[in-house]
Amino acid sequence: MAKRRADEPEDSDIDVSSTDSENELEDEQQQGEEGEDIINVDFDYFDLNPDVDFHAIKNFLRQLFGDDATTFDVSSLADLILTKNSVGTTIKTEGMESDPFAILSVINMTENINKPCLKTVVDYVLQKTSKNLEFNLMLRKLLEAKDQKATSSSKSLKVGLIISERMINMPVEVVPPMYKMLLEEMTKAEDAHEKYEFDYFLVISKVYKLVSAKVQDAEAPQKSKKKKVATNEPVPVEMDYFHYEDMVLEENAKYFATYDYNEARQDTDSRRVFTDYGIDPKLSLILIDKNKLAESIPQMEEKFPPF
């Protein structure tokens, strides 16, 4: 799938999500006459653009880190994402100068581990995984490898921090092409060996659980796609996904777990919108090796095919 770069003119070729034929338009008109509201949107894939995307990426980072967002220097993290020769994709609907609706990129954690903004992230995930011994030890091995002197018999393992976030109403079907393009870009980058040859990827994401409204008792649990996840609690908790592609990543992950945020900035009951349930968001951490990430992409494409 092709995408536009920042230096390409607006009339360049690009693969979009859908191109309507006359028959499709007729079908949509008939559906509209039956009372259904239909909005056609073409999603365009673009390279990262430092001149346009900085503030939107900051907002996506705040959204991604949830209630603990104030812990992080999102401005400096956005700068890292938008560094020269960075890789990643944004999705827009009104040209390259418009704000993105989604982003997928990767930060080299090994190369930037001593930068304060990234060290905060490392300290955070190590603190969160402290009660998951194997997960924590693996992360320490990977993220403290910078202090080891690589020799001919041993080398430091490289870790990439995947940043994936989108507007809440964006369909999951746009995600598999973004992951596919990301892996292709990392392979073809000029400094691919030095900068993007990762052994593992850490994915910071979000899940949530539905909680009964405080104003009334819930008569029955709401049906939804659920998962069982490991937490700091001794009993597994049923969660729903904000990012449904995480289902595939977790199936292939080395480790994954969910955690409470350090800061609860909004009462769960106040998050209710047209439902009898409140939403209690949780932090999700996924560690996946490079081969399993590559295997995940066709699985995503099969599970979430394009429109």
Curated annotation (Swiss-Prot):
Compartment(s) of residence? Cytoplasm; Nucleus
Q: Name one GO cellular component term.
A: cytoplasm
Matches recorded under InterPro entries = BCP1_family
What protein family does this chain belong to?
A: Belongs to the BCP1 family.
Task: Please give the superkingdom of this protein's source.
Answer: Eukaryota
Give residue spans, biased composition: Acidic residues: 21-36
Entry keyword Protein transport? yes
Q: Which Pfam families match?
A: BCCIP
Mind telling me what this protein is named?
Answer: Protein BCP1
